[in-house]
Amino acid sequence: MTTTLTAPTPAAAEAPRKKWTVAEVQALFDLPFLDLVFQAQQVHRAHFAANEVQRSTLLSIKTGGCSEDCGYCSQSARYDTGLERERLLPLDEVLEHARAAKAKGSSRFCMGAAWRGPKDKDMAPVLEMVREVKKLGLETCVTLGMLKEGQAEQLAEAGLDYYNHNIDTAPEFYGQIVTTHTLQDRLDTLDKVRDAGINVCCGGIVGMGETQTSRAGLIAQLANMTPPPDSVPINNLVAIPGTPLADGGTIDGFDFVRTIAAARITMPTSYVRLSAGRQQMSDEMQALCFMAGANSIFYGERLLTTDNPESDRDDVLFARLGLRSV
């Protein structure tokens, strides 16, 4: 006889719960696929409008030349990926991109810089970008790497809404992906962000050769944050020639949907974002992800250095599925 897990009622889902164990998250992955997606959809509807999807646009404001050795990343200075190193974009160019993003329906504008962490001299221009983008009526997000003492407070004073800092993968798999910093380094920056009163955007990458248990470990690590991230981007690895993961593992489409569903069930009030790798997904697979509780996408033709579905394709998909942008 198959045992299914009962979806929490809204009241139960809001109540504090014990920490998720990896075994408990693995039990979600082990459910029959339709049972898992059904449970995730119930949890999703208890906390969000079922047919609303938040759109974010991501811009690389400083490309390439990063000192870190993240095995998936085209922007590491350690790998020959053919990517040209660029300086920090000027403010007027950033604002041009932000205005275009808003005109196309994005509500959040994310700015990413390929640094281990920002130097003190980098902060002033970034803070100005945050202030000016906010004046356009957009939510602001930055991903700048690891922060030093006081930098999160500077960002908060500038009005930053979200700080993105992904933990990438499960603790036990982390050292196989990056060696120039630790998972604890990432968690320390997230603590600084929370203490400064900035919303946290934190997720990971799947399809890097990890096991399903490692994917369960990633979800458990995210869900057990106090509080869980406000936004949880789930990336499907885009293999970049020249990186150590150029010939890395892939993930079955149904397993990717299972990862989305597990994120929704364990983090019921977080936005779960379909991030990198959407270009390779069929419309049908994306629809399954929305059924499983994804309610945010990166919108626009480019994600830092990788391709993303064209805006027109997303508009058509939203119309076919009856989805509304927020």
Swiss-Prot record:
Pathway: Cofactor biosynthesis; biotin biosynthesis; biotin from 7,8-diaminononanoate: step 2/2. One of its GO terms (biological process) is biotin biosynthetic process. It is an enzyme of class 2 (transferase). Binds 1 [4Fe-4S] cluster. The cluster is coordinated with 3 cysteines and an exchangeable S-adenosyl-L-methionine. Binds 1 [2Fe-2S] cluster. The cluster is coordinated with 3 cysteines and 1 arginine. [4Fe-4S] cluster binds at C66, C70, C73. Belongs to the radical SAM superfamily. Biotin synthase family. Homodimer. This is Biotin synthase. The gene is bioB.
